[in-house]
Amino acid sequence: MADTYRTERDSLGEMKVPAEARYGPQTQRAVENFPISGQRFSRRFIQAMGLIKKSAAETNLELGNLDPGIAKAIIAAAGEVADGAWDEEFVLDIYQTGSGTSTNMNTNEVVAHRATELLEDAGSVHPNDHVNFGQSSNDTIPTAIHISTRIAIEEELIPALQHMHDALAEKATEFDGVLKSGRTHLMDATPVRLGQEFSGYATQIRKGIERVRLVAAELEELALGGTATGTGINTHEDFSRHTIAKIALATGISFCEADDHFEAQGAKDAAVNAAGALNTIATSFMKIADDIRWLGSGPTSGLHEICLLYTSPSPRDRG
């Protein structure tokens, strides 16, 4: 059993780490300290962390903060992390220390280990002194939250919502000539066209997209550069501006430095606002689904105004 582990040392002492792992003692301590949910960070979040470390190393190389060989090795290793080459090395539970220090160090250790491999015998890369140079968990983790969420909104959520909107709008046109009873509190009311009801559903989704775009703009403000407490202590005055410009270039999204680092790090109001927009969209989904279910109820004792295709056997078809 001893052959499957290696012993590493950090400020708290010795720690046994799986022999083949590219993470180090701080990650292993977090594995043992926080075995809470079994849920790990998403690919999007790991991608964002890799992008931050790569962009930071590029800036530190330009500013002369790191040895060129070490900086280039970090750039290559962090690029591999961003591309998904080492996702299995990100072993931590999403529930951990409030600042996300464990995941920041997981990233630093994986990048440092891989960068040292790339250097072969030409040097050694330290997770704190080199990979995390000019950064803190308190600004990198909030930055990764914004980057990963903003990219997911752009690449996944909005296209899916647009597809749903287009399908509902198409049905609104198709059903425009279908006359039915309107209802208030389920009681018959003045006539409406089925297409009009579906146009309302399509508009709900369109407005949901508009709301998401508004909150997405807030997520483009990044906390990077505030370091530990928002003051920017121990980092170069040009570090955040240059690094965020690189992140914006790599993603094609207009990321910028937060105008107030104390707000950006002391609160997550932009993320809460985004969650609110998602909650509104989910509520729209529930409303639409409930209406369609009600319209399709029956066929003998419900409304049965529309026919829904079976997606699974009905209980009455069994036995």
State where each predicted segment sits:
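A helix-coil-helix interface module used to build multimeric assemblies
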Residues: 2-226, 236-250, 316
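Short, glycine-/Ser/Thr-/acidic-enriched flexible segments
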Residues: 20-22, 28, 110-112, 279, ...
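Long, charged, glycine-rich C-terminal linkers/tails
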Residues: 94, 304-306
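Acidic, glycine-rich loop-and-beta core segments that form the ion-binding/anion-interacting portion
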Residues: 230-304
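Conserved small/polar residues in nucleotide/adenosyl-binding loops
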Residues: 310-319
